UniProtKB/Swiss-Prot annotation:
Classification of source organism: Bacteria, Pseudomonadati, Pseudomonadota, Betaproteobacteria, Burkholderiales
Function: Negatively regulates transcription of bacterial ribonucleotide reductase nrd genes and operons by binding to NrdR-boxes.
Swiss-Prot/TrEMBL GO biological process terms: negative regulation of DNA-templated transcription
UniProt KW keywords: ATP-binding, DNA-binding, Metal-binding, Nucleotide-binding, Repressor, Transcription, Transcription regulation, Zinc, Zinc-finger
GO terms assigned for molecular function: ATP binding; DNA binding; zinc ion binding
InterPro entries, per database record: ATP-cone_dom, NrdR-like_N, RNR_NrdR-like
Pfam entry (one): Zn_ribbon_NrdR
Cofactor(s) demanded: Zn(2+)
Protein name in UniProt: Transcriptional repressor NrdR
Keyword Hydrolase: no
Entry annotated with the keyword DNA-binding: yes
Domain ATP-cone: 49-139
Family: Belongs to the NrdR family.
Amino acid sequence: MRCPFCRHDDTQVVDSRVSEDGAAIRRRRRCSACDKRFTTYERVELALPAVVKKDGSRTEFDRRKIVASMQLALRKRPVAADAIDAAVARIEYQLLASGEREVRSEKLGELVMNELRQLDTIAYVRFASVYRRFEDVSEFEDVIEEFRRAAPAKTPRKR
């Protein structure tokens, strides 16, 4: 594998382990030329459905777009990169399991929101505000109220 830092072709695998609920192999590599380390992921490549956008155009499913949108929603939140990768892997699995050749962008957005809801409620609200195009504060209040109804009552923390 080529080093991303110096572009040298000779790198060694330092460590390998299964990650993302068994969906990928995480490898730590070291470049023999510049001695820098980097991480690679090896995963099975499967044919995911095409994404049908709101305007009717079609595009290939792009895992990087899903990861980027989740990272943006999770910015400065205490969620590990592995948790994001696992969430995206679950989305991909759901899409593959559906057996559909196409998925509407709205459905994909809902899958992302479901995963964010499990990872971090703040990120969920951030993503929902953009995805659902919130126009005023009352829409934020509605989502927050939804969480309050769904969450069991918590006892106040002592300070």
